Amino acid sequence: MASQGTKRSYEQMETDGERQNATEIRASVGKMIDGIGRFYIQMCTELKLSDYEGRLIQNSLTIERMVLSAFDERRNRYLEEHPSAGKDPKKTGGPIYKRVDGRWMRELVLYDKEEIRRIWRQANNGDDATAGLTHMMIWHSNLNDTTYQRTRALVRTGMDPRMCSLMQGSTLPRRSGAAGAAVKGIGTMVMELIRMIKRGINDRNFWRGENGRKTRSAYERMCNILKGKFQTAAQRAMMDQVRESRNPGNAEIEDLIFSARSALILRGSVAHKSCLPACVYGPAVSSGYDFEKEGYSLVGIDPFKLLQNSQVYSLIRPNENPAHKSQLVWMACHSAAFEDLRLLSFIRGTKVSPRGKLSTRGVQIASNENMDNMESSTLELRSRYWAIRTRSGGNTNQQRASAGQISVQPTFSVQRNLPFEKSTVMAAFTGNTEGRTSDMRAEIIRMMEGAKPEEVSFRGRGVFELSDEKATNPIVPSFDMSNEGSYFFGDNAEEYDN
């Protein structure tokens, strides 16, 4: 990528860093992890959780959500100005699961947000530690990406459900900052922009007045983020057109959908980070591991090593398969919802199946679910190999893909050819090539038609043995090409509902 030199690495975004060298970055990411771990330990003490209960992923999610809610200033202000019955704007809480007399019980806890903020700051040497908060948001986002297929959201904005591989980060809150923007897929950015344009079409005052100026600058900023994710001049030029439009409307929506479709073959750069649940960091810190001193990276071997030595449990519903639940969480931990399943199976060392074949629902348990028959089991989050996370889309070529998901967005920098269903993608590009963007459209279509199936992405890159910490001996995997490569294949995953 040409502009790579001007970009901060995503560890710097993660830690609000000015330019830092690799050692400083590893230390500041480590410091962030330490803070999350210390906070988690303190919360387990407050809630009187046993070691086992503290390693339960459902408890981890509740505790993470509590601190995110305590620091959500806009929502907190909104709640205070619009009081609703039975909701105390100053309190936050959720379900905590405890083992009582040999069975799992749900207990709803409620805390002052002020108290949670105090505990969080204390764990983070008095700072607000926004990087740590964003880290937890990205973990939740990765878990959503693995659990739900956002068909409805795609259809509502006029996009095609088969474009789900572009939807990474679609449930990230707006306040997730630069680190959040880095992990958003092309489709996510396009969807945010289309929603904005639609509001402008329906509400005459949306772009006007004092507020309209802020709206406009947010619009242009989002266009620039999206432009920065594209890797070809024509796609970027198209984003300039959309950004400079005097009065964004249907023409811009058309252009955005066109550019999103094109990203199925001419993939954008989307960052991937392994963000783990707080219940992994807590026990590691309490066992005396010093992340800041040792250094930590979200994109190298560190998360793999940490998961190799972690014990995490999950509640399991009566008809769920614990191995499938493990796969779901493993994929979320490595931000791998849209990666090629054949590569994931190779790295994990066990077969990774498409979402529709998994007998498991989401990790969170709804408040109306019956606890009587809940069991718990260990999540198997270990891997056979490790690989470096990528922030590029890899170059492009084609291969048979599926009815559900017709392209992948690579997570790991490992040599392979990237599957996508060229005939299906190209079929969407007949017709409209007139208008302001016609030359760019023609150029983009020409590049897509030139994409070759035998081209290899990430040439020479491989996976590594877990003993190979310095990544000296890459192992280039070989794949069974007859296997299905897409996770959301002709899928029946539940929809994501806020």
From Swiss-Prot:
Domain of life: Viruses
Compartments reported by the entry: Virion; Host nucleus
GO terms of biological process kind: symbiont entry into host cell; viral penetration into host nucleus
Keywords: Capsid protein, Helical capsid protein, Host nucleus, Host-virus interaction, Ribonucleoprotein, RNA-binding, Viral nucleoprotein, Viral penetration into host nucleus, Virion, Virus entry into host cell
Renumbered ranges of motif Bipartite nuclear localization signal: 198-216
This protein's record includes keyword Mitochondrion: no
Pfam families named among the record's database cross-references: Flu_NP
Region (Disordered): 1-21
InterPro entries (alphabetical): Flu_NP
GO cellular component, one term: helical viral capsid
Post-translational modification: Late in virus-infected cells, may be cleaved from a 56-kDa protein to a 53-kDa protein by a cellular caspase. This cleavage might be a marker for the onset of apoptosis in infected cells or have a specific function in virus host interaction.
A GO MF label: RNA binding
Sequence ranges of Basic and acidic residues compositional bias: 8-21
Motif interval(s): Unconventional nuclear localization signal: 1-18
Function: Encapsidates the negative strand viral RNA, protecting it from nucleases. The encapsidated genomic RNA is termed the ribonucleoprotein (RNP) and serves as template for transcription and replication. The RNP needs to be localized in the host nucleus to start an infectious cycle, but is too large to diffuse through the nuclear pore complex. NP comprises at least 2 nuclear localization signals that are responsible for the active RNP import into the nucleus through cellular importin alpha/beta pathway.
Subunit field text: Homomultimerizes to form the nucleocapsid. May bind host exportin-1/XPO1. Binds to viral genomic RNA. Protein-RNA contacts are mediated by a combination of electrostatic interactions between positively charged residues and the phosphate backbone and planar interactions between aromatic side chains and bases.
Family label: Belongs to the influenza viruses nucleoprotein family.
HAMAP family per the UniProt record, alphabetical: INFV_NCAP
Official protein name in the record: Nucleoprotein
Organism encoding this protein: Influenza A virus (strain A/Hong Kong/5/1983 H3N2)
